[in-house]
Amino acid sequence: MFNDIPVFDYEDIQLIPNKCIITSRSQADTSVTLGKYQFKLPVIPANMQTIIDETIAEQLAKEGYFYIMHRFDEDSRKPFIKRMHEQGLIASISVGVKAYEYEFVTSLKEDTPEFITIDIAHGHANSVIDMIKHIKTELPETFVIAGNVGTPEAVRELENAGADATKVGIGPGKVCITKVKTGFGTGGWQLAALRWCAKAARKPIIADGGIRTHGDIAKSIRFGASMVMIGSLFAGHIESPGKTVEVNGETFKEYYGSASAYQKGEHKNVEGKKILLPTKGHLSDTLTEMQQDLQSSISYAGGKDLDSLRHVDYVIVKNSIWNGDSI
């Protein structure tokens, strides 16, 4: 019965250190393999309009990071694939499940992307299963990521349909209000949901949403994630596509959810909101800091690579690790 499983989130967990076996954190290897490719970090900037654009996707691919391009500029997807392939870079795009997307997928046979993410808010759906099967029939070599889901049943069904990885997380993100608008989701127990889903998974899981600190990346890996998708920590950079807004002499960047009125351009089925984040430095600096913090996590885990994080003990700290402090 579900109510018997422990329910917790990132701030309720502390990982327990092991004896360190490396002399410098720079010896810790943060690389991860997804499909046929190796990437520098197990981290993916969220495929949202205020997080990633074609320029950032190109920069990430050149530097050895994984990326997923958003699906909200549909006509530019084929030229984007061409541009990436001309530079010898991987193409990783998103699709929805509407009827015209089937034709679009079939048209990719001439220039096939290495990765396609089926990206809808409630991914445990016949429409997603049908699209997975269609992609796998038309583009058998393409690595298919499907989501988003929040239960082991959903993970199994999408894997059985042919998904190569599933994305876990329904509404735990900072600008996602699914949990408030619908009463459903993994907000407040995303880490427990990840653990629950990972136990059923035979293929990689991508934890998506609810990441507030770099330490949460290590916690996600401990509870079964192969990769971690992050929105708010990647928003607000100088290069971020979000609009720059000045308030009382300070500069901010817009950050909004993928199902928000701002993204949809109209007021319907809204499950996202818009916030302003203080402008921070360059994206490359954040990625470097994330890598260094993850290397420190590996050193605390007593290992040399990400696998060591999967085996550490943990405690559930019910008064929250912040103890009244805010991040």
From Swiss-Prot:
Gene Ontology MF terms in the entry: GMP reductase activity
GO biological process: purine nucleotide metabolic process
Reaction equation(s) it catalyzes: IMP + NH4(+) + NADP(+) = GMP + NADPH + 2 H(+)
GO terms under cellular component: cytosol; GMP reductase complex
UniProt cross-references to Pfam families, sorted A to Z: IMPDH
Coiled coil start-end: none
Keywords from the named record: NADP, Oxidoreductase
Domain of life: Bacteria
EC id: 1.7.1.7
Gene3D superfamilies the UniProt entry points to: Aldolase class I
Active site as annotated: 176
Residues given in the record as NADP(+) binding sites: 205-228
Its job: Catalyzes the irreversible NADPH-dependent deamination of GMP to IMP. It functions in the conversion of nucleobase, nucleoside and nucleotide derivatives of G to A nucleotides, and in maintaining the intracellular balance of A and G nucleotides.
HAMAP family with a match to the protein in the record: GMP_reduct_type2 (MF_01511)
Family membership: Belongs to the IMPDH/GMPR family. GuaC type 2 subfamily.
Protein name per the record: GMP reductase
Gene that encodes it: guaC
